[in-house]
């Protein structure tokens, strides 16, 4: 149970970082 929770948290963190980087790149391209 603990491993599933930690894995889900890790996956969520990776998704957040990836989306943040993607938005940042899009903003740089728009400028």
From Swiss-Prot:
Keyword set includes Transmembrane: yes
Localization of this protein: Plastid, Chloroplast thylakoid membrane
Domain of life: Eukaryota
GO biological process: photosynthesis
Regions crossing the membrane: 4-24
Pfam families: PetL (PF05115)
Protein name: Cytochrome b6-f complex subunit 6
Organism name: Cucumis sativus
């Amino acid at each position: 149970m603990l491993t599933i929770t930690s894995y889900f948290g890790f996956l969520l963190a990776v998704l957040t970082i990836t989306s943040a980087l993607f938005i940042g790149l899009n903003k740089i391209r728009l400028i």
